[in-house]
Amino acid sequence: MSLDRLKLNDVSNKDSLLSNCKYSVTRSTGDVTSVSGHAMQKALARTLGMFLLTAFNRCEEVAEIGLQYAMSLLGRDDSIKILREAGYNVKCVDTQLKDFTIKLQGKEYKIQVLDIVGIDAANLADLEIQARGVVAKELKTGARLPDNRRHDAPDCGVIVLCIAALVVSKLAAGDRGGLDAVERRALNVLKAEKARYPNMEVKQIAESFYDLFERKPYYIDVFITFGLAQSSVRGGSKVEGLFSGLFMNAYGAGQVMLRWGLLAKSVKNIMLGHASVQAEMEQVVEVYEYAQKQGGEAGFYHIRNNPKASLLSLTNCPNFTSVVLGNAAGLGIIGSYKGAPRNRELFDAAKDYAERLKDNNVINYSALNLTAEERELISQQLNIVDDTPDDDI
């Protein structure tokens, strides 16, 4: 049974207006930004490792380099495509390496530093000098830095992006009130990594990402797409696993979060239900694409500001519908929900949605992948007699 007839008129009208519009706007015309291809991965990760290794007092560049590292994992062409599809017309310049001369103990050395738009190569040269100084100091003591404490450890780039994932979860607030929370969370989750790199400036790195996302909002689209891609790939290192967990939590703490059928009042990310990261991916992508169809950022605000309408308009997303049913109808709102909802209006909207599903006999148990025990519990809570085949329920 189609759920289209459950849509509210205002949602249908908005959908029609948006889908029939023949025009678009172009943003950020004249902006110039670097984009990095796969070949730049090693150099970008190594530079990020230097920020972790040293107590470098200029961390404002670290976020830009971190996003370039994310682009290098996505690939140059895909990164440009993401920017274009998000409605940004920025001029993209390929990241390259440039020769630079530094002096160490009276001797000149030729090195290569990253050539990135908006970053002074001299700062990166100073960073290289400090990193070499840390390594030399260790060698003087007769010790050798373990491989996982060096600036060229393979997971340095992802460690920095873990902090970015925490920052994304706070962007919806519109201010930096969450900076201290980001720092505390990062020091807790990245405890082992902080032990490896005791000079890691977590707060400064977080501030760098706040600044970057404010100056270049198009990087948010790049980072979210990267996070989805990274989180959907099986395997990987321990830190990559940490990133996936942090990103998916951030993707739920920010924009449109459904937990027990309640839409949280925040903007930028989506996370649905209580399933694992892998199981959430289809639901996340589904609603993210819906919001993009509604007009990108405007789509997220539409979902946030119209909870009742949005719950109904999103019923054309099958994975979303099954999660709403599992959380709102099956596991809480109808039946034995305990506790006082923080927002009564949102609670009532979700409850009304769940009841409509029930009244119109559109509950599809097979879409929920329930155990026999869960199915029995939901049937009891919904007060439904299960006397029809699975696919027809």
Swiss-Prot record:
* InterPro entries referenced in this protein's UniProt entry, alphabetically: Pneumo_ncap
Query: What UniProt keywords are attached to this protein's entry?
Result: Capsid protein, Helical capsid protein, Host cytoplasm, Host-virus interaction, Inhibition of host innate immune response by virus, Inhibition of host interferon signaling pathway by virus, Inhibition of host PKR by virus, Interferon antiviral system evasion, Ribonucleoprotein, RNA-binding, Viral immunoevasion, Viral nucleoprotein, Virion
The record, for Pfam families, names: Pneumo_ncap
Quick one: a GO biological-process term for this protein? Answer: symbiont-mediated suppression of host PKR/eIFalpha signaling
Which Gene Ontology cellular-component terms appear in the entry? helical viral capsid; host cell cytoplasm; ribonucleoprotein complex; viral nucleocapsid
- Keyword Ribonucleoprotein on this protein? yes
Q: Where in the cell is it found?
A: Virion; Host cytoplasm
Give a yes or no for keyword Ribonucleoprotein in this entry. Answer: yes
Residue ranges of coiled coil: none
Signal sequence coordinates:
none
Query: Which GO MF terms are attached to this record?
Result: protein serine/threonine kinase inhibitor activity; RNA binding
Q: Which family does it belong to?
A: Belongs to the paramyxoviruses nucleocapsid family.
- Subunit field text: Homomultimerizes to form the nucleocapsid. Interacts with the phosphoprotein P. When in a monomeric RNA-free form, interacts with the phosphoprotein (via N-terminus). Interacts with protein M2-1; this interaction allows the association of nucleocapsid with the matrix protein.
Q: What does this protein do?
A: Encapsidates the viral RNA genome by forming a left-handed helical nucleocapsid that protects the RNA from nucleases. RNA replication depends on the availability of soluble nucleoprotein. The encapsidated genomic RNA is termed the NC and serves as template for transcription and replication.
- Protein's name according to its UniProt entry: Nucleoprotein
Give the organism, scientific name. Murine pneumonia virus (strain 15)
